[in-house]
């Protein structure tokens, strides 16, 4: 649910009435989050509080901690998007593009409505709190529906996907309803095309069960865990950097995307990676990047390699 802290139409929104306004906002939170008819049968995945405040608006101080406490009391582990170092932060732009590197850690004293956009986009490897940078963008040119505008092309959505989800962070794609409260047919068609593309992208894991050689920390973190397809296992090593791993796919496979994932239960630790493929007996670069995080999608040339 998106409930902006700035209510431009409320007569209570004034520095002389901060206590009244904060109570007013808190009452709205309680009304929405405690009603079983709202959300998904009363459950909410995320409460979205942006940092917007119009030019010339009163600089009312918000009682964020009281609001956050109420959200947690009523919705448990519901994610909170805000400027205040909560579980989700803004990525620093409204294009849906995350940075590389992208650390999901930040320092609280560098956040707030005046936070540097570059800091939000890349995070901080020395950060003291875990706050995921959420990439947000609209399927249309703006956040609201206009009849004379069209949705983004499939190619544009694919680029956004690889620069957000493909860089280890969630994508919030805005779909504005029209004046009848319905999604436009063109938007719906584009969403189906986008879903078809993603389904095709993940249709087959060519590396599933592939033989992997390289150093490993222990049997509990063996190399085979890299390709066993299980969410509960992972590989790790304490060897000196750079660490090299080699995958044998068993037979030549044709591909142009490689997916890497990191076991975030152990923290976000990968700071750089480099992928090569052997083509006709010669090793050549496929691609490289910095952080991995929850998921990294690396695009390269279409190759046939084992």
Show which residues each predicted segment covers.
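Mature catalytic domains of secreted/periplasmic carbohydrate-active enzymes
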Residues: 1-225, 238-239, 259-261, 268, ...
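Non-catalytic surface loops within mature trypsin-like serine protease
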Residues: 5, 139, 177, 251, ...
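Hydrophobic/aromatic beta-strand segments within beta-rich folds
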Residues: 210-212, 230, 243-262, 275, ...
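Non-catalytic extracellular/lumenal accessory regions of secreted precursors
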Residues: 231-235
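Short loop/turn segments at connectors of secondary-structure elements within structured domains
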Residues: 241, 254, 267-271
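Short, surface-exposed beta-strand/strand-loop-strand elements in extracellular ectodomains
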Residues: 268-281
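Tryptophan-centered short beta-strand motifs
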Residues: 283-285
């Amino acid at each position: 649910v998106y409930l902006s802290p700035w209510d431009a139409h409320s007569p209570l929104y004034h520095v002389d009435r901060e206590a009244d306004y904060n109570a007013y906002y808190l009452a709205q939170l309680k009304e929405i989050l405690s009603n079983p008819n709202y959300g998904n049968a009363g459950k909410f995945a995320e409460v979205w509080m942006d940092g917007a405040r119009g030019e010339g608006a009163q600089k009312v101080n918000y009682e964020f901690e009281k609001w956050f406490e109420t959200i947690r009391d009523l919705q448990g582990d519901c994610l909170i998007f805000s400027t205040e170092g909560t579980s989700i932060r803004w990525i620093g732009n409204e294009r849906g593009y995350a940075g590389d590197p992208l650390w999901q850690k930040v320092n609280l004293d560098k956040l707030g409505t005046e936070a540097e956009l570059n800091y939000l986009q890349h995070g901080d490897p020395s950060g003291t709190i875990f706050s995921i940078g959420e990439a947000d963008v609209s399927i249309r040119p703006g956040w609201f529906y206009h009849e004379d505008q069209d949705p983004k092309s499939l190619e544009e959505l694919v680029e956004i996907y690889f620069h957000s989800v493909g860089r280890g962070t969630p994508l919030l794609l805005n779909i504005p309803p029209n004046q009848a409260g319905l999604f436009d047919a063109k938007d719906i068609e584009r969403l189906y095309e986008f879903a078809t593309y993603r389904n095709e992208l993940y249709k087959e894991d060519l590396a599933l069960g592939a033989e992997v050689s390289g150093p490993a920390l222990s049997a509990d973190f063996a190399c085979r865990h890299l390709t066993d397809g299980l969410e509960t296992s992972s590989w790790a090593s304490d060897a000196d950097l750079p660490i090299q791993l080699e995958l044998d796919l068993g037979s030549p496979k044709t591909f142009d995307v490689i997916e890497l994932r990191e076991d975030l239960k152990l923290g976000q630790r990968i700071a750089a990676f480099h992928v090569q493929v052997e083509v006709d007996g010669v090793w050549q670069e496929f691609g490289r990047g910095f952080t991995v995080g929850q998921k990294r999608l690396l695009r390269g040339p279409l190759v046939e390699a084992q």
